[in-house]
C-alpha cells in the first residue's frame, strides 16, 4: 500500500519542493508466521530517478511479487538475483523487497540485519541536517534548534534554486553564523554547470564549506573529475553513482572523494554495501544519504551504516525528523547529534498499525505477499 505522510516544513530541492512524503509499504509473510517489513520511497515523485510511488507499487504488484511468492525467504540472495534476471532496472522497487526479505531473515535467525551484512562497527551515525527553506534567518534558527536539541551536529544547505550570487550570499551568511559551532556542506542537486561550480568553489571554501555535493549533471563524470582536482573541499557524488558499475567508473576517473550511499538508488542494502567496498578500495570515503525515509527505511540505513568500517562524515539519514508522523511504534532515536542503531532482530522496528491505517492512501492496493 501507499502511505502519504505530512512533512514538518517544505523540503526545497534545486528544482522543486516537497510538502509531504509518500512511501510504498511492503509486508512479506512467511509460512512460519514471520512478517518482513520493507518500504520503497522517493522524494517528490519521479524527478530524481524517474520512479514514483505509483509506478513502484505497480511494478511490485504485477512483476516482482509473483517472482517472490513461494520462495524460501532464507534464499534472499538467490531471490534478488532472480528479480534482477527477470526485471531490468526498477532499483527502488527491488530495494523495498530486499528490505522486507532481510527483515524476515533477521527475524527467522534472531539477528539484526547488520549481522547478516558482516557485523557491527558502530551503534550510532553522526547526523547532518538539510537546510532547505531558502530563507537565511529561518535556516539559521533551524540549525541552532537542531544543535541545541542534539539532533544534528552538521548542516547541508540545499542550493541551486536561486541565482548563484544570491545562493552564495545565503551560504556565506549561514557559514558565518555556524563558524566554530558546526560544519556546513552544500548540495546544488545538479543545478550548476562546470564553470558555475568553478566560480563558486573559492567563496564556498573560504567560508569553510567542507563538502560540495553533486554540483553538475549526473552524467558528467569528466566535469566532476576536473572539479575534484580543483577543489579543496570534499566533492561528494550522489546522482552520478547509482550502480556498482557507476561506482567503478567514479573510482577509475577519480570523479569524487566521497560517495553517497542510498539503499533505494542501488536496489538494496547488499548492493549499497558492495558500493562502499568499491569506493573504499579506490581510496574514497562513503556517506549515508537520504531519500527522506520513514523510520522503516531509516532503520535499514542504520543497519547498513553499522556494518561499514569508515564513515568519517556520517550522513543525513533524517527522514523521521522531517516527517511529522511516524509508522513505527518506536520512532528512530536521535540524540547526541547522532542516529542510533535500533535493537532487535531484522530491522529492529515494529509497525504502528493505527498509523498505517490513518495515512494509507484510499486508492492504494495492499502489497501483502507470502513467501516460504
UniProtKB/Swiss-Prot annotation:
Coiled coil: none
Presence of keyword Acyltransferase: no
Alphabetical list of Pfam families matching this protein: MR_MLE_C, MR_MLE_N
Biological processes per GO annotation: amino acid catabolic process
Pathway as given in its UniProt record: Aromatic compound metabolism; 3-chlorocatechol degradation
A GO molecular function held by the record: manganese ion binding
Cross-referenced InterPro entries: Chloromuconate_cycloisomerase, Enolase-like_C_sf, Enolase-like_N, Enolase_C-like, Mandel_Rmase/mucon_lact_enz_CS, Mandelate_racemase_C, Mandelate_racemase_N_dom
Group of enzyme by EC: isomerase
Catalytic activity: 2-[(2R)-2-chloro-2,5-dihydro-5-oxofuryl]acetate = 3-chloro-cis,cis-muconate + H(+)
Gene3D superfamilies from the UniProt entry: Enolase-like C-terminal domain, Enolase-like, N-terminal domain
Binding site for Mn(2+): 187, 213, 238
Record-stated family: Belongs to the mandelate racemase/muconate lactonizing enzyme family.
Protein name as catalogued: Chloromuconate cycloisomerase
Gene behind this protein: tfdDII
Amino acid at each position: 500500500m501507499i502511505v502519504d505522510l505530512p512533512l514538518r516544513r517544505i523540503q526545497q530541492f534545486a528544482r522543486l519542493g516537497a510538502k509531504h512524503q509518500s512511501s510504498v509499504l511492503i509486508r512479506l509473510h512467511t509460512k512460519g508466521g514471520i512478517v518482513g517489513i520493507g518500504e520503497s520511497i522517493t522524494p517528490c515523485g519521479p524527478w530524481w530517478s524517474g520512479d514514483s510511488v505509483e509506478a513502484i507499487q505497480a511494478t511490485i504488484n504485477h512483476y516482482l511479487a509473483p517472482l517472490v511468492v513461494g520462495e524460501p525467504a532464507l534464499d534472499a540472495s538467490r531471490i534478488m538475483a532472480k528479480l534482477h534476471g527477470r526485471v531490468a532496472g526498477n532499483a527502488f522497487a527491488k530495494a523495498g523487497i530486499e528490505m522486507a526479505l532481510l527483515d524476515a531473515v533477521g527475524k527467522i535467525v534472531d539477528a539484526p540485519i547488520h549481522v547478516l551484512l558482516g557485523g557491527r562497527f558502530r551503534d550510532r551515525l553522526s547526523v547532518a541536517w538539510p537546510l532547505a527553506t531558502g530563507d537565511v534567518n529561518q535556516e539559521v534558527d533551524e540549525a541552532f534548534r537542531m544543535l541545541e536539541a542534539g539532533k544534528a551536529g552538521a548542516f547541508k544547505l540545499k542550493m541551486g534554486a536561486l541565482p548563484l550570487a544570491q545562493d552564495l550570499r545565503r551560504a556565506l551568511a549561514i557559514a558565518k553564523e555556524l563558524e566554530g559551532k558546526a560544519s556546513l556542506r552544500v548540495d546544488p542537486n545538479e543545478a550548476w554547470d562546470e564553470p558555475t561550480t568553478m566560480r563558486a568553489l573559492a567563496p564556498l571554501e573560504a567560508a569553510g564549506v567542507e563538502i560540495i555535493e553533486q554540483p553538475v549533471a549526473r552524467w558528467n563524470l569528466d566535469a566532476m573529475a576536473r572539479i575534484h582536482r580543483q577543489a579543496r573541499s570534499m566533492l561528494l557524488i550522489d546522482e552520478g553513482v547509482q550502480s556498482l558499475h557507476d561506482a567503478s567508473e567514479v573510482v577509475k576517473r577519480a570523479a569524487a572523494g566521497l560517495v553517497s550511499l542510498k539503499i533505494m538508488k542501488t536496489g538494496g542494502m547488499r548492493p549499497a554495501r558492495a558500493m562502499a567496498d568499491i569506493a573504499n578500495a579506490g581510496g574514497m570515503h562513503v556517506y549515508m544519504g537520504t531519500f527522506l525515509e520513514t523510520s522503516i527505511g531509516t532503520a535499514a540505513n542504520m543497519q547498513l551504516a553499522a556494518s561499514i568500517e569508515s564513515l568519517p562524515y556520517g550522513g543525513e539519514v533524517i527522514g523521521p525528523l522531517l516527517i511529522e508522523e511516524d509508522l513505527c511504534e518506536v520512532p528512530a532515536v536521535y540524540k547526541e547529534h547522532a542516529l542510533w542503531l535500533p535493537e532487535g532482530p531484522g530491522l529492529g522496528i515494529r509497525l504502528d498499525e493505527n498509523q498505517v491505517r490513518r495515512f494509507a492512501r484510499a486508492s492504494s492496493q495492499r502489497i501483502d505477499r507470502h513467501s516460504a
